[in-house]
Amino acid sequence: LPGKTYQRLVDNEIEGGLVEDLRCCIVAGSPVIVFRKRRPLERRFLNENVQVLLDEPRNCYTSDEIAVIERFAASIGLDWGGVDVLRDRSSGRIYIVDANKTDMGPPVALKLGAKLRATRRMAQAFAVAFASKKR
């Protein structure tokens, strides 16, 4: 779309020759958890993570960036799902590069304990946001 899209290679390389994608899980339009998905630079475009860390949105984004992610989710009607965010190494800017209406849940490479914590956090946020208050 003219004026709405563009193509750019985001330099999301981090220390150790890895790239890092930030998968932000959205519940009720807000980031709840972040999976830091890391893989070797030469496998940048493959889904072959060598390390996945569970993190909090406030540790990955500024409050202004969280507001941007929330506005993006609202603009596309994303109450529940996941967005992939890349941070450019030289500018520090974030780029939302993908949105999924069915979040994939914890990545395979995440350790079991972190998978369970992530699933509980998402379930709790989902229950608070969407479960009926009536019994």
Feature roles, as predicted:
Residues V83-V85:
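Hydrophobic residue at the +6 position relative to the catalytic HRD Asp in the kinase catalytic loop
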